[in-house]
Amino acid sequence: GDVVKKKLHLPMAGGEGDIYILYIDGLCNNEFVSETIIKPLTWEWHDNVSPDLMNLIWEYGAQTADITKEDNFDNAVWAAMKGDTAVFVSGSSEALVVSTKKLPLRGIDESSVESGMRGARDSFNEGFRTSTALIRRRIRDTGLKVEQGVIGRRSRTDYALMYIEDLAEKELLDDIRERISAYEIDAIYDSAMAEHLMEKKWYNPFPVFQSTTRPDKAAAAIADGRVAIVCDNSPEVLLVPATMNTLFQTADDYYNRWPVAVFARIIRYAAAFIAIFLPGIYIALTCFEREMLPDKLLYAIANARSNLSFPIVVEVLIMELLFELLREAGIRLPEKLGNTIGVVG
């Protein structure tokens, strides 16, 4: 399989010892493992070298790598599952973990979900450390804290809370930590799953978390005192708290002059109001408050509906359902076919 286990028998002064190397093929840099771990350990050691193999590897092996000691073998194995290399020595109660990650990741592309006219063009990808680095690159403040942890009993997914220590509210941080510690789940594959699990009221129609794929927007939110939740394997970062105002805010608002940004936000509020209440207003005016409509408009609506056998309420519900079907088809179907469905619809 992809689990690689190597055994090295090392003769030296004062006795002999075995070294076991564990790593995952495809998650680590195989060439780096060979050049910085295996090859140095196969050199001919001199008689004056200490017979303590653990210290021998610590001092002479993998000198160019980030190497740490681990007194818990389970943690060393979990590190190997993430792409590092675990080194075990016979007779030793410690293991060495060498940073050799080379995960299969896509590049940093422009966000296809949150496009904008101005600002940076990069976006998060599925790499955990890449996402935290994109935020750290924009906030070079010593007060920026990164609390890292693991969630999921089997997936062991990395996550991080990113915030500025003197800006984020302590009560908010305590609440987030409490919700995360209450997780009872085998695997977390995306930040969206973490979002659903952290919601206390599943029936609440309003989002408690705001998601973004743009590092500049996440950095601006952190600078405003909010908390960013970064999850491994997810191209989206969660921002808390999420208020109605923040949900109508885009990344362009940070770059445009305030009159332009305010006008654009007013347009968004108006569009949301129309989208939510227009069907109900249409039903109320055509069924119950006809006298509020001009006579010509009322006659036009009556003529248009003269050949329809559905009540107005059913007609509106069918229209809403068709919009949802077209939206779902545009998302799920292949890109070219989805665009065609949208045009025809």
For the regions a language model picked out, list residue spans one by one:
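Membrane-embedded alpha-helical signal segments
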Residues: G1-I274, D295
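Transmembrane alpha-helical segments that form the functional core of multipass membrane systems
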Residues: I229, A242-G345
